[in-house]
Amino acid sequence: MAAFKEMKWAITGGSGQLSRSLIDLLDQEGVPYTAWSHQDLDVADESSISVIKENSPDLLINCAAWTNVDAAEEFPDKATRVNQVGPRNMAQVAKELKIPLIHISTDYVFSGQSQQPWRTHSKTEPMSAYGLSKLLGEKEITKSLDADFYILRTAWLYGPYGKNFSKTILKKAITSKEPINVVNDQIGQPTTTKSLAEQIFKVAKSRVPSGVYHATNTGQASWWDLACEIFELVGEDVERVRPSTSEEFPSKVKRPKYSVLDQSAWSKVGMESMPEWRRALKEVFPEICKAVEREL
C-alpha cells in the first residue's frame, strides 16, 4: 500500500460543507484526492461504481447524503435512494478495490428519548424518514464489509461552507437588532466541519479497528446555547436570544430531544475524542465570519 501522504482519496458529495472542509485539510497536507459533487457522481446509480474504480483510489470517503430532514418526510424514496442505495454501492466499490471506506452517518439513527449519552451499541430507533434511511445505509455497509469500514456518526454540523444554523444566527446577529427565538429543549453536540474533517484524517492515518464511532465535538448544548455563544463571540447582546420550545416551531419531523453521543469508543482504540464544542467554535469562528461577510 502507498505511504499515507501518497494515498489517493476519493470523496463523494464533494460540494457539501463537510467535504469542502476535508478538501481544505487535504490541500494543506499535500494529500492527493478526487472529489465528486452530486452533480458529477450519483452514488445511488450503479455507474458510480465503475467511475470510482477507474480512478483507482486507496481510500473512499462517502460524504454524499440526502440531509434535508423535512423533505425526507415528503420524499422518503428519494432520501432512501441516496442514503441507503448510495452506501450499498460505495461498499461494493470498497470491496472490489479492497480499500477502506469511511462513511458519515448521524445521531438521527437514535430515538432521542434518553437522558444518557448514546453509545455506539445503543439501540437504534429512528423517529424520522431521514433517520431510517441513514440507519439502512449503515446496515448496507456492515452487511457488505467485514473489515476496513468506519461509520462515523456526527451531529449538528456547521462551518464556513454551505447553509447551516451557525451562519444563519450570525447573519441575524449582525444585520438586525431584533430579538430572535431559539429552541432550548433539544440537546445535542454542535460540531464543526473542521473538527470532523480532522477526525476523518486521523482515522484514515491511524487505521483504527473497523466499526462504528461517534464523531462529534464533546460536551453538550441546546440550539439556544449555541446561538448565545455566537452572539457573545461577535459582541452582540445575548439578551436578544430568547429561549423557546420545540412546540413553538411546528415541524413535520420529530427531532431528537436528546442526541448527545458517547465518545468512549475513541479512547478504547487509542485515539482522542474531538475538541469541546465551545473551543471548536472559537477556532473556526473567524472563517465563519469571513464567509458570512462575503454572503451579505
What are these regions (language model features)?
Residues 2, 7-25:
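N-terminal Rossmann NAD(P)H-binding glycine-rich loop of SDR-like oxidoreductase domains
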Residues 12, 36, 60-64, 101-106, ...:
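SDR active-site strand-loop-helix element
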Residues 27, 31-48:
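Adenosine-cofactor binding site in Rossmann-like domains, unifying the SAM/SAH pocket
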Residues 46-82, 95:
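NAD(P)H-binding glycine-rich loop region in Rossmannoid oxidoreductase-like domains
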Residues 81-89, 96, 109-152, 156-157:
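Catalytic helix-loop patch of NAD(P)-dependent Rossmann-fold dehydrogenases
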Residues 139-188, 194-201:
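NAD(P)-dependent short-chain dehydrogenase/reductase
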Residues 199, 206-252, 292-296:
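Mid/C-terminal beta-alpha module of Rossmann-like enzyme folds, strongest
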Residues 222-228, 245-284, 288-293:
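Conserved C-terminal active-site "lid" loop/helix of NAD(P)H-dependent oxidoreductases
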